[in-house]
Amino acid sequence: MAAVLVGSEVSVAGKLSKVTVDVDASKKFSWAEGKGSLVWKINDSDLALRSTNAGIEVKLTPKKGTTTSGIVLDLEGAKLTLSCGYKSVVVLFELGETPEGRGFSEMRSLSASNLSLLRMAN
């Protein structure tokens, strides 16, 4: 299952596989860790990943007056790929069971200058 998101708030529940983000390398691109979720800032728009009892919820909330073309969600595995111009970040998720249901158990983030292993709390 794939969904192309353009300029509106979208929620998708399912097993997260791949997210490809194609934006200009000069645009803002960052991410922040939250309790049981990840939030990416893509050109001032939020792409949030949250664990739910049904699986993984992906929610895109564009900044008012902006569009978010080029973001593709592929919900068929456990891999998340983000590409930003010349920079590429690959994030691998291992889904684990929590008292609240399925959630993120581990996140590995790779880039040309960064290799880290982060534990996520639910």
Swiss-Prot record:
Kindly provide the name given to this protein in its UniProt entry.
Protein 6
Q: Which organism is it from?
A: Northern cereal mosaic virus (NCMV)
